Amino acid sequence: MQFDPPLQPAILLKRYKRFLADVVTPDGRELTLHCPNTGAMTGCAAPGDTVWYSTSDNAKRKYAHTWELTETQQGAVICVNTLRANSLAKEAISAGIIPELSGYNQLKSEVKYGEENSRIDIMLQADDRQNCYIEVKSVTLAEKEYGYFPDAVTTRGQKHLRELMAVAANGDRAVILFAVLHSAIDRFSPAHHIDARYAQLLTEAQDKGVEILAWKAELSTTRMTLNKPIAVVLNPGK
């Protein structure tokens, strides 16, 4: 995925109302950015961090600028735009980068499925194999070398795990793909300390045939690529 035109830098003043952030540009202008992230954004939004933003030419948008990346004062680069995770996953799958998800000739998005009124992020299909249902999650919470999901209690995420378990029980492939969008993360774990129920369900899902993958993105202000598998540790410390 390329940013064209390249992203522009600014210094974060504050994030507020979840969807807005005030920044100051190198030439001293103050801008309000759209923040496409409803999570806690722990460690991703400290005042004084450098943010990188894109600009839309859509005149109907109230806020023309979108917060894409954070460059923390500790040197980490983080993609805070959670909408990018699905696009990165689709690109990586289509390019054959993720071997576990290769061999399919059709890729569909936002397909209705399940018993809880859900839509799957990605469905892969081929004539010679069962359908593959893929739920994509964006990982930006870092503690030491670990990346954690979720960064807040997520009943929606719990629902998705229940739906994936039902898919696996019916004989199709069920995959949860954690897209790691933080340069300092080298392994993934569910956030037991934030949402114990989600962590419990993820372990249960694996036991019932749901495949768990974690892939890390290479991030820059000009392009992003999901290209590196990292270890999944369901119960760190045990």
From Swiss-Prot:
CDD domains, per database record: SfsA-like_bacterial
Q: Name one GO molecular function term.
A: DNA binding
Give the organism, scientific name. Klebsiella pneumoniae subsp. pneumoniae (strain ATCC 700721 / MGH 78578)
InterPro entries, per this entry?
A: SfsA, SfsA_C, SfsA_N
Task: Please state which protein family the record places this protein in.
Answer: Belongs to the SfsA family.
Q: Which Pfam families match?
A: SfsA, SfsA_N
* Entry's transmembrane regions: none
- Name the chain's protein: Sugar fermentation stimulation protein homolog
